[in-house]
C-alpha cells in the first residue's frame, strides 16, 4: 500500500539542464541507454516549455512504464523521475509490491492510466496515487467507497472523449457537467482535471480541451485543486505543451519498444 505521507505530484524535470550529472549505482549499468533516453525527453520537455515562455515546473513528465520491468522503474527513480503510469493492473500491482521496500522508490507516484473495470476498482483505490481514466460515475462511486481512510484522497482526472467518437473511451464533453457535479461531492476523491487521447486528425483537440478546462475552472471555483491537464505523448508533446498541457505521458521514447 502506498505511503500516506507521500507528497502530491509535482514536476520532476530539472530547471537547469546542466544539472544532469548522472549518478548510477551498480544495478543501473545495464540501463545506461534508458537513463540517456529519459534525459533526452526531459530536455525536450524543457525546450518545448521555453519555446512558449512557460517554466519547466509547469509541466510534469509521466513515464509510462507499462510492460517494462520494475528494475527500469527503479533506475529512473534513482535519477529523480517520480511519476510513473501503468495501464495493466496486475502487472502494476506486482511492480508496486516489488519496489515498495526500496528506499529510492518510496516517493514514486503511481498513476493508473488504463481502462477501469468494476471488479478492479478496489485494487486501484488501495494502491494508486492518481487515476487518469475516470469516465463514469459508477466507477467514481466505487473508488470513493474503496479508498482506505488512512490514505489521502485519490487524485482523479476525467478522461474526455474529445473526438466524440462512439468507439473511443471517455466522457463526452456534453456530459462533463453531470459527472463533475457527482464527483466533487466524494470526500475520498480529489478531482484535479482532464485527460485526453485525441485522434491525430483532430488538429484542434488540445486547444478545445484547454478551453474546456478553463471553462470548468471558472464555473466551479470550489474545485480548489483543479490544476492538471494531461495531454500530449511522444509525437505531439510540444504541441500539447504549447496549448497548456501540465502533464505529458511518454513511454516508448523513454523505455523503448515493447519486447
Describe each region flagged by the PLM.
Residues 2-6, 12-235, 241-243, 255:
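Conserved alpha/beta-domain cores
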Residues 245-259:
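Gly/Pro- and small hydrophobic-enriched strand-loop and loop-to-helix capping segments
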Amino acid at each position: 500500500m502506498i505511503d500516506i505521507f507521500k507528497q502530491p505530484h509535482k514536476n520532476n524535470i530539472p530547471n537547469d539542464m546542466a544539472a544532469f550529472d548522472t549518478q548510477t549505482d551498480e544495478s543501473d549499468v545495464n540501463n545506461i541507454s534508458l537513463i540517456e533516453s529519459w534525459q533526452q525527453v526531459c530536455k525536450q520537455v524543457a525546450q518545448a516549455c521555453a519555446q512558449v515562455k512557460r517554466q519547466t515546473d509547469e509541466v510534469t513528465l509521466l513515464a509510462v512504464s507499462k510492460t517494462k520491468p520494475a528494475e527500469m522503474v527503479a533506475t529512473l527513480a534513482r535519477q529523480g523521475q517520480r511519476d510513473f503510469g501503468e495501464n495493466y493492473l496486475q502487472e502494476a500491482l506486482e511492480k508496486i509490491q516489488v519496489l515498495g521496500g526500496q528506499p529510492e522508490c518510496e516517493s514514486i507516484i503511481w498513476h493508473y492510466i488504463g481502462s477501469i473495470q468494476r471488479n478492479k476498482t478496489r485494487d486501484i483505490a488501495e494502491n494508486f496515487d492518481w487515476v487518469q481514466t475516470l469516465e463514469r460515475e459508477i466507477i467514481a462511486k466505487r473508488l470513493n467507497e474503496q479508498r482506505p481512510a488512512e490514505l489521502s484522497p485519490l487524485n482523479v482526472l476525467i478522461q474526455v472523449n474529445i473526438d466524440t467518437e462512439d468507439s473511443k473511451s471517455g466522457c463526452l464533453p456534453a456530459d462533463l457537467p453531470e459527472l463533475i457535479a457527482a464527483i466533487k461531492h466524494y470526500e475520498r476523491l480529489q478531482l484535479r482535471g482532464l485527460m485526453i487521447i485525441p485522434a491525430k486528425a483532430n488538429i484542434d483537440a488540445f486547444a478545445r480541451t484547454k478551453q474546456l478546462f478553463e471553462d470548468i475552472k471558472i464555473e466551479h471555483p470550489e474545485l480548489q485543486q483543479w490544476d492538471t491537464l494531461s495531454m500530449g505523448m511522444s509525437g505531439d508533446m510540444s504541441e500539447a505543451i504549447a496549448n497548456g498541457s501540465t502533464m505529458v505521458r511518454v513511454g516508448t521514447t523513454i523505455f523503448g519498444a515493447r519486447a
